[in-house]
């Protein structure tokens, strides 16, 4: 009888483990569709083979691994991200989207992923800075739907600055090089690695002082109703920060602290 009971206990344990396997596998095959605009190296950009790579992508892939899901990267224009999220064409936005009060009225955000300063880029020797007074009458390019556009419209336009919005950041750079605009406002890292460190950016540099957009850093945008997904991603981010994985990923791209306070 004793051996029979032991066998029953072992059998019950094995059956319990077997029953757990489909649940794990189901979680592992779950797909999270991240919307991204691959025009922001080193955050996200198209590789020669057509795949999307960058800091955001590496962070997203690690998050998916930790929540036992598979990432699917959906290429979208930045200005169309929130509408696509509401239309359920994507599950989340991971594309250097700053956490702002205006956006928080429409969607939820995860905890912060990173936080960078913003700068003005112009041709070397430009006789203006990043303050509204010196920019009066100038044409400044920004990406449509970005926090840079919001800042420029509220802080500069009332003082006579002409703000030109573009669908993509590469279009901003193209018009800057061709002289159609006098300057561009964007994130420091995207400006430095995506333009100034490239051949077409050799005649340009930062002008004026760094600017604060009033945001709370960059997070992952999620529908407000997706409470469970947000909680699981927040837990993944916290564990990445705690075990050093976040720092290891960041060091692939940057030599400075990307997270901030």
Please provide the spans of the model-predicted regions:
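Bacterial N-terminal signal peptides
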Residues: 9-19
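Bilobed "Venus flytrap"/periplasmic-binding protein-like clamshell domains
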Residues: 33, 38-41, 52-65, 98, ...
């Amino acid at each position: 009888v004793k051996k029979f009971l032991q066998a029953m206990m072992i059998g019950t344990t094995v059956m319990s483990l077997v029953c757990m396997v489909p649940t794990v596998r189901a979680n592992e095959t779950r797909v999270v569709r991240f919307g991204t605009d691959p025009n922001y190296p080193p955050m996200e950009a198209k590789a020669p083979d057509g795949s999307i790579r960058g800091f955001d992508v590496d962070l997203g892939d690690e998050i998916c691994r930790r929540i036992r899901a598979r990432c699917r990267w959906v290429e979208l224009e930045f200005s169309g991200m929130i509408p696509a999220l509401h239309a359920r064409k994507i599950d989340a936005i991971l594309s250097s989207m700053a956490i702002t009060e205006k956006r928080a009225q429409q969607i939820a955000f995860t905890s912060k992923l990173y936080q960078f300063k913003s700068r003005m880029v112009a041709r070397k020797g430009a006789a203006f800075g990043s303050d509204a007074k010196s920019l009066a009458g100038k044409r400044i390019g920004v990406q449509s739907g970005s926090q840079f556009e919001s800042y420029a419209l509220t802080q500069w336009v009332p003082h006579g600055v002409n703000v030109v919005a573009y669908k993509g950041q590469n279009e901003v750079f193209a018009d800057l090089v061709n002289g159609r605009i006098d300057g561009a406002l964007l994130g420091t890292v995207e400006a430095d690695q995506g333009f100034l460190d490239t051949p077409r950016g050799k005649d340009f540099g930062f002008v004026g002082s760094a600017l604060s957009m009033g945001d709370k850093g960059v997070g992952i945008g999620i529908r407000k109703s997706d409470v469970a997904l947000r909680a699981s991603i927040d837990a993944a981010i916290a564990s990445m920060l705690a075990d050093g994985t976040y720092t290891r990923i960041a060091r692939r791209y940057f030599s400075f602290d990307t997270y901030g306070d």
